[in-house]
Structure formats: C-alpha cells, structure tokens
C-alpha cells in the first residue's frame, strides 16, 4: 500500500489491508491527471485480482499473492470496472512494450517464487523445498535483471523519458 499511496493503512508486518481503503491512490491521481496506469502481475488468476491468493486450493502452491498488489484494496479502483481491469498478467507487459502501448505508470509485481523471500511450501515450483534464502534472492535478482533487460531493450525505452524504480522489501 505504501508504494501506491504513500500510506500503510494499518498494514504492519505481513498483514494485508483491511479490505477497502477509501483514500486517494497514485492510480487515482494519475487518472485525474489524464495519465494511464497498469499493474502487471505474475501468475494473476484468470478471474482477476480478487482478495485471495491463487490458486485457491490446498494442493497447489499459491504463487499470486494479492497482499503484494495494492490496487484491489483501493475503493476508487474497486468501484470503477475500467480501472479495476488495469490489473493484468505480467505477460501482457511484453506485448505492450512491443506495440509501444505502455502506460505512464507500470507497477510490476513478481509471484511468490520470484519476490526474494519465496515460499516454504514444497508444492511451489520455485526450485524445490530445499531452497535457501540465497536462492530466493538470486531468483529475485534474476527476475529483476530479466525484466529490466526487456524494458530497456524495447522501442519505448529509446525516447529517453523513462525511469525504472526497483524496490525490495527484504534487506539484502
């Protein structure tokens, strides 16, 4: 929540927001300024970003974690289907880059295999239950490098009016 609105809304530690936040967000401010935004989410469920992890069964690792995506919690996005639909699969980023149709603000969220702290679930296809913290960090570094290369290698990057801001929640 902090990255999308400069506030934490009571989300201390690993807790998710309380479900609905009725305060301004970065996405809402961009829309008011006539700018576009999109959230590119790795392993997002086909049914959307609803307030759950995905997949929702007990036999599969939950790779998409809504707690890493602030937008489903924001009332002004929840209440506007057009804005809510701007949460898309990460794979769409590459098509958008190739067609030069990227938004003014792109928020990219890796799944729980590539977020630098991984999953302890042996069902997770992250590299096995014997993963170490070092492997989690390496996987996150590799994912970040791969994404930066894709972005900076695209025609969109060539105009020079771009920036990449990468954040990591866990100390490295």
Residue locations for each model-derived region?
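N-terminal pro-sequences and low-complexity stem/linker regions of secreted or lumenal proteins
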Residues: 1-172
